[in-house]
């Protein structure tokens, strides 16, 4: 072995002990509330169709797969957990490894710990309040600020993301020094998201967590469209100290609508020169069988612990980051 090989953990033992304590506290938070802990597969024959998510892919060649079987490491346990909900599990949570074939850096590692939970009969606001309770307990922070996506844009960019045209979006991007990128982007949603990333995110959640809710309906993903305003989806995200912590929905229960969204994602992927992804027929069958009205959220545990310990980067709270894996 080379003398320069970095065999040591990327996190200190002291931080790993604190990490274990935080994870135990998170488990207690849910068990004390009667939420069932579950385990679901780390691999699946289907994967996400989201244009901006990149799953790891492998090949199963063992007995029972003579011609080989393509499997994907899960970017989130969402699809399997919804199948449990459809089977009558009641409220559930999971702490698990998730995998995304994306960047590695201060706030990213391709293998990370996800906390995901689902609450039957909760609307989006009730789940947001529960997320806020968890953050206050783990981070010892103030109660979060709650603002709509529209309010966030009006406050920080002085434009309405629900009605602004592409010319105005490019003008706003120019003011942020993003004109060269914006002029090459023709997709309105991508322009809106770019402005949110560079013009809104850095300005929210500085002193206390910020919940941004009612994302544009075109960014609904697996969320229901609001019955009060069809321009927006029942979707929220959570930000604190420059970090995106969580992404939640009032979950879409209509199997036909979900199929249409998956197919639309694949059309967008094709337009960008990306491979089209296999649609999860098992999830759609579960939705057709009957997913209870529910809300769910995915939260990045490593990022949560990083904030709790006031660490500089994820590798300070992960035993072995990808560079030392």
UniProtKB/Swiss-Prot annotation:
The lineage of its organism: Bacteria, Pseudomonadati, Pseudomonadota, Gammaproteobacteria, Enterobacterales. Belongs to the class-II aminoacyl-tRNA synthetase family. EpmA subfamily. GO terms for cellular component: cytosol. Substrate binds at residues 76-78, 118, 251. The gene is epmA. This is Elongation factor P--(R)-beta-lysine ligase. Keywords: ATP-binding, Ligase, Nucleotide-binding. GO terms for biological process: lysyl-tRNA aminoacylation. It comes from the Bacteria. Homodimer. GO terms for molecular function: acid-ammonia (or amide) ligase activity; ATP binding; lysine-tRNA ligase activity; tRNA binding. Gene3D superfamilies: Bira Bifunctional Protein, Domain 2. Disulfide bonds: none annotated. It is an enzyme of class 6 (ligase). ATP binds at residues 100-102, 109, 244-245, 300. It catalyses: D-beta-lysine + L-lysyl-[protein] + ATP = N(6)-((3R)-3,6-diaminohexanoyl)-L-lysyl-[protein] + AMP + diphosphate + H(+). PANTHER family: ELONGATION FACTOR P--(R)-BETA-LYSINE LIGASE, LYSYL-TRNA SYNTHETASE. InterPro entries: Aa-tRNA-synt_II, aa-tRNA-synth_II, aa-tRNA-synth_II/BPL/LPL, EpmA, Lys-tRNA-synth_II_C. Its EC number is 6.3.2.-. It comes from Pectobacterium atrosepticum (strain SCRI 1043 / ATCC BAA-672). With EpmB is involved in the beta-lysylation step of the post-translational modification of translation elongation factor P (EF-P). Catalyzes the ATP-dependent activation of (R)-beta-lysine produced by EpmB, forming a lysyl-adenylate, from which the beta-lysyl moiety is then transferred to the epsilon-amino group of a conserved specific lysine residue in EF-P.
């Amino acid at each position: 072995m080379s003398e320069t090989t970095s065999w040591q953990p990327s996190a200190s033992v002291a931080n790993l002990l604190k990490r274990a304590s935080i994870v135990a506290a998170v488990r207690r938070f849910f068990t004390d509330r009667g939420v069932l802990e579950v385990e679901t597969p780390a691999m699946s024959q289907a994967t996400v169709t989201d244009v901006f998510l990149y799953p790891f892919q492998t090949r199963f060649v063992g007995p029972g797969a003579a011609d080989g079987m393509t499997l994907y490491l899960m970017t989130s346990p969402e699809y399997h957990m919804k199948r449990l909900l459809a089977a009558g599990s009641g409220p559930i949570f999971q702490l698990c490894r998730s995998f995304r074939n994306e960047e590695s850096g201060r706030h990213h590692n391709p293998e990370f710990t996800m906390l995901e939970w689902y609450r039957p009969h909760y609307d989006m606001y009730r789940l947001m309040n529960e997320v806020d309770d968890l953050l206050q307990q783990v981070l010892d922070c103030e109660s979060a600020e709650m603002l709509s996506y529209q309010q966030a844009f009006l406050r920080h960019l002085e434009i309405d993301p629900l009605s602004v045209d592409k010319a105005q979006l490019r003008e706003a991007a120019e003011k942020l020094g993003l004109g060269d990128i914006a002029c090459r982007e023709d997709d309105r949603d991508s322009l809106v998201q770019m402005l949110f990333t560079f013009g809104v995110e850095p300005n929210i959640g500085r002193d206390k967590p910020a919940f941004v809710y009612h994302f544009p309906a075109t960014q609904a993903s697996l969320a229901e469209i609001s019955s009060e305003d069809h321009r927006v989806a029942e979707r929220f995200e959570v930000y604190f100290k420059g970090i995106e912590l969580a992404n939640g929905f009032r979950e879409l229960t209509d199997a036909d609508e979900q199929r249409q969204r998956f197919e639309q994602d694949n059309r967008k992927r094709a337009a960008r020169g990306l491979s089209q992804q296999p649609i999860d027929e098992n999830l759609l069958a579960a939705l057709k069988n009957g997913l209870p009205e529910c809300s769910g959220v995915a939260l990045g545990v490593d990022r949560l612990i990083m904030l709790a310990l006031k660490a500089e980067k994820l590798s300070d709270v992960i035993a072995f980051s990808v560079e030392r894996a």
